[in-house]
Design a protein with these regions (language model features):
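Basic, Lys/Arg- and aromatic-enriched nucleic-acid-binding interface segment
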Residues: 185-220
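DNA breakage-rejoining catalytic core of tyrosine-based enzymes
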Residues: 153-188, 249-268, 286-290
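Active-site/catalytic core of tyrosine-dependent DNA strand-transfer enzymes
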Residues: 266-323
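Catalytic-site neighborhood detector that most strongly recognizes the C-terminal catalytic loop/helix
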Residues: 360-390
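Short, basic (Lys/Arg/His-rich) helix/loop patches that form interaction surfaces
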Residues: 194-196, 310-358, 362-366
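Conserved tyrosine-mediated DNA breakage-rejoining catalytic core shared by Y-recombinases
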Residues: 225-273
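N-terminal core-binding DNA-recognition domain of tyrosine recombinases/integrases
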Residues: 6-25, 31-160, 190-197
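Short, charged phosphate-coordinating catalytic segments
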Residues: 131-136, 213-238
Length: 402
């Protein structure tokens, strides 16, 4: 982004605080939307010199436009051009018209989570930009501007739909057992239901990718960031490492673990499949005369990109029972399976959450593991509540169900 303040924020604030390149890119895209919706924000210096900040009208326009897809965002002050109706028929189908309007609406607007994140990143940038100006002020002028900036931030916060992160209501769910059976059968290279073309390398590679994600839990970027040197064939252990701004990674969207490193022990079946893939990988690289340190590669010998993982998921969604599958759902499935197995074995909930943090690469302060254990954590409380209800609200004709 060719902008002084955005670049200064990215380099001086985000980069120094440990943000990865992909995270910085995401936040800068949000700032680009801010500039598009409110062109005045691309050069706030004249306004700041007058001691002014964003107005309520401008802020309302920004919040409205953040609901739109990037290409549909309208600059402040521009009139939104009406859509001229086609005059092909005097009589039109009401159902067809409703369908077109619904499609147009869906194509133009983003979901609530996307808007929330956009707003969050823009608030972060505007807060930083205001702070940069505040440090140059003194006395009453400083206090007045700080109050104005705080009011705008509070206004944005009050008018932004919040995402409910309470683990009691948002515990993520993975594939159920029946869906997992369908998935594992479909990715078998010899299965007649295998959705990928009859190429041994592609089928074995895709099977390994899915198995790693659903059986050990790494994110999509974590799998793509694995190097061949991260696997120790003697111990059967695999490292998932975060290599921020890796100079050897030339992919447009850099990969790697989102958080810190984690060490995964693989069982015999996964080790066997991994070694089978390594043999095919070596033959392909020799044939293509290519070299890459990354484990998962394309049929051309290049490091596989995230878009290819998305293609793998799209192929699987064509299979009945797997219509809603996506990369992160496999991580949810792994975590849900891990918790269910540990609870069945009598492992303490606190220990399960600690194990999830270690294996899943979450920080010690992360509450994400509690989203997976919440259903089991509150099960005893729900049981006691039902017992109390039965005691205090007896049935008129109490009968034991057959």
């Amino acid at each position: 982004m060719p902008d002084y303040w955005a670049n200064r924020w990215a380099v001086g604030r985000l980069r120094t605080s440990g943000h990865a390149a992909n995270s910085i890119s995401t936040k800068l895209r949000a700032v680009a939307l801010l500039y598009k919706a409110l062109p005045v924000t691309s050069d706030l210096t004249p306004r700041l010199a007058r001691g002014e900040w964003l107005t309520v009208v401008e802020t309302d326009h920004l919040l409205q436009q953040l609901s739109r897809r990037a290409e549909a965002v309208q600059p402040y002050g521009d009139a939104i051009a009406p859509i001229a109706p086609k005059r092909e028929h005097k009589v039109v189908s009401l159902e067809n018209m409703r369908s077109k309007l619904t499609t147009r609406h869906d194509e133009e607007f983003v979901d609530t989570n996307t808007k929330f994140l956009r707003t969050l990143f823009i608030r972060e940038f505007l807060g930083w930009r205001a702070d940069q100006h505040i440090v140059s002020l003194r006395g009453a002028t400083k206090a007045a501007f700080a109050e104005a900036a705080a009011q705008v931030d509070a206004y944005i916060d009050d008018h932004t739909a919040k995402i409910n992160n309470d683990p009691r209501f948002t515990n993520p769910k993975g594939l159920d057992e029946a869906q997992q059976d369908v998935l594992l059968e479909a990715i078998n290279p010899d299965s007649p239901n295998n959705p990928w073309k009859n190429d041994r390398f592609i089928r074995v590679r895709n099977q390994l990718v899915v198995q790693l994600m659903v059986a050990t839990g790494p994110r999509r970027g974590g799998v793509l960031g694995i190097r061949t040197s991260d696997f120790d064939p003697l111990t059967g252990r695999l490292q998932i490492v975060r290599r921020k701004d890796d100079p050897e990674d030339s992919r447009p969207v850099q990969t790697g673990n989102k958080k810190g490193a984690c060490l995964i022990s693989l069982d015999y079946g996964l080790i066997k499949n991994l070694k089978t893939y390594l043999v095919l990988r070596h033959k392909l690289l020799v044939h293509k005369r290519r070299q890459t340190p990354y484990l998962i590669i394309s049929s051309k010998g290049d490091a596989l990109e995230q878009s290819s993982i998305n293609y793998i998921m799209r192929s699987l969604r064509a299979i009945p029972g797997l219509e809603g599958i996506h990369p992160h759902l496999l991580r949810h499935t792994w975590a849900s399976n891990f918790v269910a197995d540990a609870v069945a074995k009598g492992v303490d909930i606190a220990m399960i959450e600690e194990d999830l943090r270690w294996l899943g690469g979450w920080s010690k302060r992360s509450d994400m593991p509690s989203h997976y254990t919440s259903a089991y954590r509150h099960r005893s409380a729900e049981k006691r509540s039902l017992e109390l209800q039965e005691k205090l609200v007896p049935l008129v004709n109490p009968r034991k169900p057959k």
